[in-house]
Amino acid sequence: MATDALKTLLPLAGWSEDHANTVEPSGNFDPILPTPFRIGETSSAALSAVGLAASDLWELRTGRHQDVAVDVRQATASLRSSNYMKMEEAPVSNRRNEVMGVYPAKNGRWSYLHCNFPNHRAAALSVLGVAEDRDAVAKAVAQWDALELEEAIIAAKGAGGMVRTMEEWGQHPQSAAIASLPLLEIVKIGDSPPEKLPEGDRPLSGVRVLDLTRVLAGPTLSLIHI
């Protein structure tokens, strides 16, 4: 069954809704995580699209069709894979920097400080004029107007911002810039003759993906392809 999120992806691949309806979703449905966003539907739609593409490629290679099934709960967990990572059966520490997070600012507004990278942490602490201590940071942020703090941190080449409502975000220039972009864009970087796919017993056997992204969203997207 094609979900609303999956339907938005259909035109990108030239798929019909009937084709997308061949996907079999299972497991829990939203809300899975404590958020108003439909993360389960979105993540399962992305993995469903990858599965359909792999199935189509396999059919082109072999003439045989594959079924596509997605567990919504597992698809959601895949976006937080670092939380469940293990090394030799032992959990891998995923502790964030202690000053990273959301803090109350003036006038009932909130500010978010992204401090995982040393340069971003240094920029935020420099603007706030405090040491690396969560209580000290909280007291300092409480003295700031959230928007003014956002502008000061950005000017210091840090990362952070005022927490906005959906309506406020919709009026922001960055929101407009993102809304004008296609969901997916393929940029050809050079010309070459077509190459035959390597032999293998899976749809993408022998195909390699070079991931040049950094931080969170990019590597997560590459993991979905893997």
Name each model feature, range by range:
Residues M1-I224:
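Acyl-CoA thioester-binding alpha/beta core of soluble enzymes
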